């Protein structure tokens, strides 16, 4: 009976085309994650600005009402 041969260094290496095919996917995933983060940051900044503007408007109304009540 023939014994199974030990895997040589050549047979254990990953095929080169597979590595090249794998890399663009990782790059695309990284760029899409970055795109999502940028969109999220823009959305949050607009939402925060709107919230701050509303709070400032409310504060101005409270101050004006207090001034009218005190005079």
Curated annotation (Swiss-Prot):
Tagged with keyword Cell membrane: no
GO biological process, one term: killing of cells of another organism
GO CC field: host cell plasma membrane; membrane
Transmembrane segments: 34-56
Region named Disordered: 1-24
Cytoplasm keyword on record: no
Membrane topology per record: Single-pass membrane protein
Chief site of localization: host cell
Keywords recorded for this protein, A-Z: Cytolysis, Host cell inner membrane, Host cell lysis by virus, Host cell membrane, Host cell outer membrane, Host membrane, Membrane, Transmembrane, Transmembrane helix, Viral release from host cell
Localization of this protein: Host cell inner membrane; Host cell outer membrane
Its job: Induces the formation of specific membrane adhesion sites between the inner and outer membranes, apparently leading to host cell lysis. Lysis may be performed via activation of host murein hydrolases.
Family membership noted in the UniProt record: Belongs to the Leviviricetes lysis protein family.
Name of this chain's protein: Lysis protein
Organism field: Enterobacteria phage fr (Bacteriophage fr)
């Amino acid at each position: 009976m023939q014994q199974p041969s030990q895997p040589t260094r050549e047979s254990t290496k990953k095929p080169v085309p597979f590595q090249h095919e794998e890399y663009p996917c990782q790059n695309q995933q990284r760029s899409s994650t970055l795109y999502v983060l940028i969109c999220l940051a823009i959305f949050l900044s607009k939402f925060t600005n709107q919230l701050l503007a509303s709070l400032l408007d409310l504060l101005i109304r409270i101050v004006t009402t207090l001034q009218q009540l005190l005079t």
